[in-house]
Design a protein with these regions (language model features):
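Metal-dependent nuclease catalytic regions and adjoining charged, substrate-binding loops involved
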Residues: 29-112
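Non-catalytic protein-protein interaction segments used by genome-maintenance enzymes to assemble
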Residues: 1-24
């Protein structure tokens, strides 16, 4: 179980978001390797601790992580590691604002 705090909970889109669920997929994968456990015997869940909800302040939902999802997740992780090692960084141009965004805005390190 991975415990998360939130205000009202997550909508179905957030619960199904691959980048959110890949976190638990990786936990399961590496836990299974470390402890020599068959991944089929491990079940993963998110537990949402809702700060402002009046009722049902804790919501627990299962995150599925079969072989194909694990393969896709590891492929994405390996691509990210490769690009980081090759110094291929993606520029977030939406963060190029003075004051609230990139700390390198209009400095010698800015390639905007």
């Amino acid at each position: 179980i991975d415990w998360k705090t939130c205000s009202w909970g997550w909508d179905s889109r957030r619960k199904a978001d691959s980048m959110t669920t890949y976190q638990l997929v990786l936990y399961k994968h590496f836990f299974a390797i470390k402890h020599n456990i068959d991944p089929k015997n491990i079940v993963t869940h998110f537990a949402l601790l809702k700060r402002t909800a009046k009722k049902n302040r804790v919501e627990i939902f299962k995150v599925t992580s079969g072989a194909k999802k694990t393969e896709n997740c590891l492929k994405l992780l390996n691509k990210a590691i490769y690009n980081i090692k090759k110094k291929r960084h993606i520029k977030n141009r939406l963060a190029c604002t003075q004051g609230f965004g990139c700390e390198f805005f209009n400095t010698q390190f800015c390639s905007r």
